[in-house]
């Protein structure tokens, strides 16, 4: 390998880094974003020193100011409105860094892509899944208060949000958080999102079905009962029966709910299912 080749590779790497970081505008909760900062592909980090630690920070022991991440689509225009596509990851949820799965699903178009961290009142090491499992009963208050503050800041920062078509989705513990918000949220939170996506989670927490009426719901779950699925063979084998009852309850309450069985999949959503989610989202966005 020649030194010229190495030098050229280093230059390309530095140029790529500069191009990417040039779009990132770090904004604290006290600052305001200028309209000139909102451009195609721009990235915003909003920080919230007044909010409690995220579940990621609690679990990792890393001291970090709670934050969220927003990515503007590549087809952004200040003359058009775009819905939020909020995505919540599973497990500890991460630190709220990076644009989130929504950007990948929508191929970086047509939405503001938001990555929120997860919140939990406290971690009980003796609890399910090493104490990380989110539940509406225990964590509803802290989740709703944190997300209310975060969404209000997003709306203060970005003027052209299409609230009528907002989407919020989550995987596993993230889906638990989405349902917790719907089960315990006030009228402000309930009015923000017309569409929700539940991936491998949240289904068993849906109790007040009337709160989901008039919303679009997409739920996905895997059918794989192999040993690599950490939820366990018994839980996976019982899931189709539970999901059948869930679908029946959704129909009874006249919910606009669509289910997708992810074939040969355990506790995951492989990228091959992105197109199914994108097509569903596009149908929701086309509604008046």
What residues fall within each predicted segment?
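Primarily recognizes the serine-hydrolase "nucleophile elbow" in alpha/beta-hydrolase
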Residues: 164-213
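Tryptophan (W) side chains
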Residues: 3-5
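C-terminal catalytic histidine-bearing segment of alpha/beta-hydrolase fold enzymes
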Residues: 220-230, 244-288
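Bacterial N-terminal signal peptides
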Residues: 13-22
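Short substrate-entry loop that stabilizes the transition state in hydrolases
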Residues: 76-127
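Alpha/beta-hydrolase active-site loop
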Residues: 134-160
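Alpha/beta-hydrolase
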Residues: 86-88, 199, 262
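A domain-start/cap signature at the N-terminus of enzymes
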Residues: 27-82, 246-248, 254, 287-288
């Amino acid at each position: 390998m020649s030194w010229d080749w190495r030098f050229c590779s280093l230059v390309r790497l530095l140029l790529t880094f500069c191009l990417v970081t040039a779009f990132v505008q770090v904004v604290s909760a006290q600052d305001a974003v200028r309209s000139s900062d909102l451009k195609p592909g721009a990235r915003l980090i909003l920080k919230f020193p007044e909010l409690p630690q995220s579940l990621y920070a609690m679990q990792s022991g890393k001291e970090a100011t709670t934050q969220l991440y927003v990515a503007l689509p590549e087809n952004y225009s200040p003359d058009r409105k775009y819905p939020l596509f909020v995505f919540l990851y599973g497990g500890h949820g991460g630190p709220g860094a990076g644009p989130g799965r929504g950007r990948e699903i929508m191929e970086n178009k047509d939405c503001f892509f938001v990555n929120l961290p997860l919140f939990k009142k406290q971690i009980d090491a003796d609890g399910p899944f090493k104490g990380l499992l989110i539940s509406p009963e225990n964590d509803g208050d802290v989740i709703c208060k944190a997300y209310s503050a975060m969404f209000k800041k997003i709306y203060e920062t970005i003027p052209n949000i299409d609230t009528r078509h907002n989407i919020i989705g989550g995987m596993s513990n993230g889906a638990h958080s989405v349902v917790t918000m719907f089960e315990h949220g006030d009228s402000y939170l309930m009015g923000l999102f017309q569409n929700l996506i539940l991936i491998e989670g949240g289904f068993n927490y849906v109790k007040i079905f009337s709160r989901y009426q008039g919303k679009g719901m997409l739920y996905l779950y895997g059918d794989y009962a192999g040993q690599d699925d950490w939820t366990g063979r018994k839980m996976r084998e019982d899931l189709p029966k539970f999901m059948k009852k869930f679908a029946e309850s959704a129909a009874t309450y006249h919910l606009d709910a669509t289910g997708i069985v992810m074939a040969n999949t355990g506790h995951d959503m492989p990228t091959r299912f992105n197109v199914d989610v994108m097509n569903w989202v596009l149908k929701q966005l086309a509604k008046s």
